[in-house]
Each structure stands twice: as structure tokens, then as C-alpha cells.
């Protein structure tokens, strides 16, 4: 999995157009002559315009020229014709000049995949079966809205190893709001009613994000916040003075200063200006004073168990020494100043918001706490500290080479805690944390079925610790543990930390390759041993550096180049030792010059040890992420077993849009 690597048809079209204009006339003339000659030899080509074909040749990866949902036969013909042109031009000064001009245009436009000095991946894509793959919106398990909900890492990994579309929790929550069951939810309604009845403070946290499909909605959704406030203030008539909100600023899955700005994105959708939106929402209930704390997500949602970040988040709510601002007015002035000084939302330090003469709110013993963010990985540390789950925190931090002191954690809080989702099973079973929407593992997950079709074998998961849950909980189909104790080997490399200057996720530009080399070394060693029939790996840098665009463009380019070198090595060794390779991505990110994920397609490439695989015929030349597991099953020779499983669950509709199918013809 190349985390966060998609491609933008719109931006590629602009690069193609401008680069064509910038080509020296002798180069474009030679390319047109070659294109005309190829068309004469390929009478089946749909478009007979030599310039159309010549301009396609400007884009390094041929499949990225295809429109979304291209008719299968037309796409095949277009790719074959383009392949003939590039073969005729290969090794000539023409293509060298084309590459130079195209890269210069990509540098001007900050289009990382072409701006990077990286030709290995393009060559791998063009030499093997490569197909556009849907990775957002409905095809990522979200609501079918326009514009689509951006793809993200957790759902992408869930889809990649599922045999059918894996529905996501945000859709389930939204459906419960629409049918009214949200307001009768046993755990949510219960914790609110207990707090109101006992006149105890009701504290809650929410990431300011997710108004529409493309401005977040990765960890939170605005309609979930609206519904919760309705539950609190309309259904249960809570006193706003006893409701305390921690508002987390995003700037990663939404524009980096969107707490204060309200940009219109490429889809014409307005998002951002979240602080103003929040003030208006709270004002409906006379509850502006309920905003108690502000903090950036890099401290409030640290998933790599960096103690200084988790401590700052905890102490800001429980009574540590925290900066203060006076009301929404003071908050807006402070954020404007911080943005002017170069801070992005994710790096905003913790602040308590004071209202009138009241002192800063503090979480105290016996209070209630609700977490309104639905994605598990970035809520675990927060909820574990509030629940006093030292064993869990020690285990997770030690696995990343970190040793916590815990001197700042209180032992007397005994909070009544409810999460919107189930963040970790141990939080419920050992520490009494409730989940409004309990976790339901995906039934049709390839890895959970692995022991049934390969009982004597093991598969290998490899990644680094910032993506530990992706190479674990998410890729297993929302399972904390493998199906059996001996079917899985997992190797997680600790991500860079404080010693390398990486205090939080905003610092990864300092080592943009991240742990790509170490992961590659482990993959090479594993393939050389020929021990595992199936190996799954995550290369994280393209996503992690994509989140730092446009500020750290050069570092993003370096991250891409590191992945390009790694893939060349991985593919070479895989072929040497008889492995097939499937290269795909969980979602788009680094191809757009913004901090957030994209709704763009990704590419899936399937490589055989020898020769070239053929695309399995389908209506359109377009895959879905949940086609990958069927492709792997076909390569492993267990397709029949997977079909029997689907039939046994009553879901044998193999032609349906929500059931996957192999990308390749039988191997």
C-alpha cells in the first residue's frame, strides 16, 4: 500500500496542456509525426487525431490519461496505441526533452508525482497491468453524496482486504440520526441523562471538521455534532454552564487554517471557518459559554503515543497550566495572530476559553466525558489517559520505543466515559468505557479467512508505528487480533521521534523518507526467505508528507522519490523469488497541493514474476479497492474457497456492484 498516493485528472490535464505549449516546435513536430505513423498502423484506435495521442505521451503513467469509468475496450485500445507510440519514441532525445518540459511544468504547479525525479514507478506501471481504482465516496463505504467524501487511510485499508464493500461507521451514525434512533441510543442518551440528573459536568470533545464531503469527515462529521447538541440541549435540557466542549482544530484533513478561513474548494463546496460555524451552532442553544478548551490535533489526537503531546492534551482539560483566551472574540483574535505567525491549525497549543468572570473549566472526579470522533486510532491515547488505562498505555508506548513517566496522570477521576465508536476493546472490558456504536468486524475480510484456506501458513504485515493500526486493526477488517494466534507475523518499525526532531506529525518533513528504507529491508529479507505466501506492507511517507503540503513541497518530493527507489528494489526482489506484486493505495493525497486527502482515484498495478498479466474483462476499465482481495485470492489460487465463503453467508451476488472481483485474468 502506497499510503496517500492518488492522481488528479484535472491537474494532469493542465500539465499536459501547458507542457504541450512549452515544447520546442521541433520536438512537438517529431512527436506528431511518430503519433501519425502509429495511428496508421493501428486502425482500431478510437481517436484518430495525432495531437491527441501525442499529448497523451506527455504523461509519464499511461493509465492516468484514461477518463473515469472508461469503456473497457476503448481504454484497452487507447493504452495499446499509446504504448506503441512510447515504444517508437523510447530512448530518443524527443522523450528526454518531453520529460524535462513536463517535469518543469509539474514543479511550477507543485504536482509531486511528476515533479519528483522518480521514473521507476512510472516504468513499473507502464510495463504491467495498471487500472484506475475508485477510493472515495460510496466506493470507500461512505454516504453517496456530491461531492464525494474524501478517501482516508482507515477505510482504504479495510476495503483493500475485504471481499465486498465494507460499510463505514459514519454512514451508520448518519442513518441513525435520520431515523431518530441516535437520540434513543442507550449509551449516548444514558450518559447525558445521568449527567443532567446528577447536575454533574458533561464534557465532550470534537474535531472541527467534516461539514461536507471534501473538507474532512475522516475522523468526525459536522452532522454528528449537530445531532449530539440537539440530544443534550433539546432532548435532555442540559444547563449550558455544565456542558464543556473541547474543540480540536484540524488543518490536516481540511485546509490548514480552516478554523478561521472559509475557502471554496475545487468542487465549488464551501468548508472551513469552523470557529464561526461552531459559535453559530452553540448560539442556537444559548451555549456559547460551553466552549471550554481549544487545541490542535497534533497534541489532542497523537496516535504514536508521544507522551508530551498526550500530556498537554490531558492537562489542558484536567487543570494544568494552560494559556487562556476570553470568549469567542479572544479566540478568533488569537487564532488570527497564530496563523499570521505561521502556525497551522494542527499545531495550535492548548488554550482554555474563559467566559465572563468564570474560571477555566476543569474535568473533575465523577464527571462525564463523551468523544464524538468516530475513528479509533487517534482517540485511543486520549481516552486511555482519561480512563486511567496505564497498562494499555505502557504496552503501546513501549512497543514504539517510548517510556512514559505517568507522573502527570491523576488516579482519582473515575469518569463516566462514552465514545461514539469502540476505540479499543480493552477500554470497554477493563476500564468501563462505553461505545455508542459498537465495533462490528467485517465478515468478509481476506486476512480473517486466511487460516481457513491456508491453515499451515502465515502471512506477514509490515509498516511503521504511525500506521500501526493500518497494518493491524484496519487491514484485519476492524479486528484487534488476528484470526488465530499463529497465522500472522507482524513487524512494526518505530517511527522517528523526538531524537530526530519529530515531536508531532507536523515535523515529519525533517526525515521525509520516514522508515521506507527499514521497511524495504525487511520485505527483501522476508521475500528472500520465501516463508510467507502473502505479505502486506504500508509505505507511509507519501501520505504523511502529503499532509504538509503546500508548506513542505520539497520534503514531499523527497518522500515520493524514496518510495520510488524502494519500489524498484521490492519489485526486482519479488520477481527474483517468484512473488507476484500488487501495488495500490488507500486514497489520494500527495497529488493535490493541499494538506487534506483527495477524492481522486488511485492506481492498482499487478505484476507477475514473469510476463505481463491481462486485465479481466469488465464493463468499464475501473476497479474498486475491494477488488484487490479477489485479485490476491486468484493469485494465491484460493478464489474457489473465497466464493464458497461468500455463498455460505448468503451473499453470492458476484455480479453486484458491492462485491469485488479479480482485476486479472486467471493466473
Enumerate the predicted regions with their spans:
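Feature captures the catalytic ectodomains and active-site-proximal regions of enzymes
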Residues: 1-14, 29-33, 38, 47, ...
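Amphipathic, non-membrane alpha-helical rod segments
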Residues: 75, 79-85
Amino acid at each position: 500500500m502506497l499510503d496517500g498516493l492518488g492522481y488528479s485528472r484535472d491537474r494532469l490535464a493542465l500539465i499536459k496542456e501547458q507542457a504541450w505549449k512549452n515544447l520546442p516546435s521541433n520536438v512537438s513536430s517529431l512527436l506528431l509525426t511518430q503519433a501519425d505513423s502509429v495511428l496508421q498502423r493501428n486502425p482500431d484506435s478510437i481517436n484518430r487525431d495525432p495531437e491527441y495521442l501525442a499529448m497523451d505521451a506527455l504523461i509519464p503513467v499511461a493509465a492516468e490519461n484514461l477518463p473515469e469509468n472508461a469503456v473497457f475496450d476503448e481504454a484497452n485500445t487507447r493504452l495499446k496505441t499509446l504504448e506503441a507510440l512510447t515504444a517508437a519514441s523510447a530512448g530518443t532525445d524527443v522523450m528526454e526533452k518531453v520529460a524535462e518540459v513536463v517535469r518543469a511544468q509539474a514543479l511550477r504547479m507543485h504536482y509531486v508525482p511528476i515533479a519528483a525525479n522518480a521514473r521507476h514507478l512510472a516504468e513499473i506501471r507502464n510495463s504491467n497491468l495498471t487500472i484506475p481504482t475508485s477510493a472515495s465516496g460510496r466506493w470507500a463505504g461512505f454516504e453517496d453524496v456530491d461531492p464525494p467524501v474524501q478517501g482516508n487511510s482507515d477505510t482504504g485499508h479495510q476495503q483493500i482486504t475485504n471481499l465486498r464493500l465494507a460499510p463505514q461507521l459514519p454512514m451508520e451514525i448518519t442513518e441513525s440520526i435520520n431515523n431518530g434512533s441516535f437520540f434513543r441510543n442507550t449509551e449516548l442518551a444514558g450518559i447525558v441523562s445521568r449527567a443532567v440528573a446528577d447536575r454533574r459536568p458533561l464534557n465532550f470533545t470534537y474535531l472541527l471538521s467534516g461539514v461536507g464531503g471534501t473538507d474532512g469527515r475522516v475522523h468526525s462529521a459536522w452532522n454528528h455534532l449537530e445531532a449530539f447538541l440537539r440530544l443534550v440541549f433539546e432532548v435532555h435540557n442540559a444547563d449550558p454552564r455544565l456542558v464543556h466542549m473541547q474543540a480540536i482544530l484540524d488543518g490536516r484533513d481540511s485546509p490548514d487554517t480552516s478554523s478561521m478561513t472559509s475557502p471554496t474548494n475545487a468542487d465549488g463546496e464551501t468548508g472551513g471557518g469552523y470557529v464561526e460555524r461552531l459559535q453559530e451552532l452553540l448560539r442556537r442553544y444559548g451555549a456559547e459559554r460551553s466552549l471550554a478548551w481549544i487545541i490542535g490535533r497534533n497534541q489532542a489526537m497523537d496516535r504514536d503515543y508521544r507522551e508530551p503531546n498526550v500530556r498537554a492534551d490531558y492537562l489542558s482539560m484536567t487543570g494544568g497550566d494552560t494559556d487562556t483566551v476570553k470568549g469567542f472574540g479572544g479566540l478568533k483574535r488569537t487564532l488570527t495572530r497564530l496563523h499570521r505567525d505561521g502556525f497551522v491549525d494542527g499545531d495550535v497549543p492548548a488554550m482554555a476559553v474563559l467566559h465572563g468572570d468564570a474560571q477555566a473549566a476543569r474535568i473533575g472526579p465523577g464527571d462525564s466525558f463523551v468523544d464524538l470522533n468516530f475513528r479509533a486510532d487517534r482517540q485511543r491515547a486520549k481516552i486511555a489517559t482519561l480512563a486511567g488505562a496505564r497498562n494499555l498505555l505502557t504496552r503501546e508506548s513501549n512497543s514504539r520505543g517510548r517510556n512514559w513517566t505517568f507522573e502527570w496522570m491523576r488516579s482519582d477521576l473515575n469518569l463516566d466515559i462514552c465514545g461514539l465508536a469502540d476505540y479499543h476493546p480493552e477500554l470497554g472490558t477493563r476500564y468501563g468505557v462505553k461505545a455508542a456504536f459498537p465495533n462490528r468486524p467485517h465478515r468478509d475480510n481476506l486476512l480473517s479467512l486466511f487460516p481457513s484456506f491456508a491453515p499451515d501458513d502465515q502471512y506477514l504485515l509490515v509498516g511503521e508505528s504511525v500506521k500501526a493500526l493500518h497494518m493491524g486493526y484496519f487491514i484485519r477488517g476492524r479486528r484487534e487480533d488476528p484470526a488465530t494466534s499463529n497465522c500472522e507475523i507482524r513487524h512494526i518499525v518505530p517511527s522517528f521521534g523526538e531524537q530526530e526532531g519529530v515531536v508531532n506529525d507536523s515535523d515529519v518533513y525533517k526525515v521525509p523518507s520516514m522508515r521506507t528504507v527499514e521497511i524495504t529491508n525487511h520485505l527483501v529479507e522476508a521475500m528472500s526467505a520465501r516463508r510467507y505466501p502473502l505479505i502486506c506492507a504500508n509505505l507511509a511517507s507519501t501520505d504523511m508528507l502529503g499532509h504538509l503540503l503546500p508548506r513542505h513541497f520539497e520534503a514531499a518530493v523527497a518522500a515520493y522519490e524514496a518510495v520510488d527507489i524502494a519500489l524498484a528494489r521490492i519489485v526486482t526482489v519479488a520477481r527474483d523469488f517468484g512473488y507476484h506484486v500488487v501495488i495500490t493505495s488507500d486514497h489520494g493525497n500527495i497529488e493535490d497541493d493541499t494538506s487534506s486527502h483527495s477524492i481522486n482515484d488511485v492506481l492498482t498495478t499487478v505484476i507477475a514474476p514473469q510476463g505481463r498479466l491481462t486485465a479481466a474483462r469488465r464493463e468499464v476499465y475501473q476497479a474498486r479497492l475491494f477488488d484487490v482481495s479477489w485479485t490476491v485470492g486468484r493469485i494465491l489460487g484460493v478464489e474457489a474457497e473465497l466464493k464458497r465463503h461468500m455463498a455460505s453467508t448468503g451473499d453470492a451476488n458476484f455480479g453486484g456492484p458491492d462485491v469485488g472481483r479479480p482485476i486479472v485474468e486467471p493466473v
